[in-house]
Amino acid sequence: MEKGLVSIITPMYKGAEFVGDTIESVLKQTYTNWEMIIVDDCSPDDGAGINVVKRYADPRIKLIESKINKGSSGARNIALKEAQGQYIAFLDSDDMWPEEYLESQILFLSNKDVVIAYGGVQRIDENTKEKISSPFPRPDRVDYKDLLKVCPICPSATVYDLS
């Protein structure tokens, strides 16, 4: 485990249309100590999403091509086995982060006894890229009992501290 490193876990299935935007949002992060592990989950798109990922020469971006479709959870688990970071962040291949997302989450996680940081989510029109709703509300505090009932936290808006 590398202290301070964020391992960004990105499952991809037929991701050619949006994965470039996803990667661009990571490249624009003000917090730059990250690795991005993208797992293509045996997409039936003749490698279109894989080709988009391969256009990026940044050594922090790693591509794993799964030969068996395991679903998004299975793809995340493949990436987790490769992750080297103190922090784990999930980001689906059709989601994007604002530029200061990682920086704000890591700053929050630097507080004593905090192991999970999460933020709100905003829907964006896939054609126009315009915001189509106000941000989904996020609870101020989530405890273990809340997580057992229903998880109010979006995976793509969550960072975990493994230390």
Give short role names for the model-derived ranges.
Residues 1-163:
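Nucleotide-sugar donor-binding/catalytic module of glycosyltransferases
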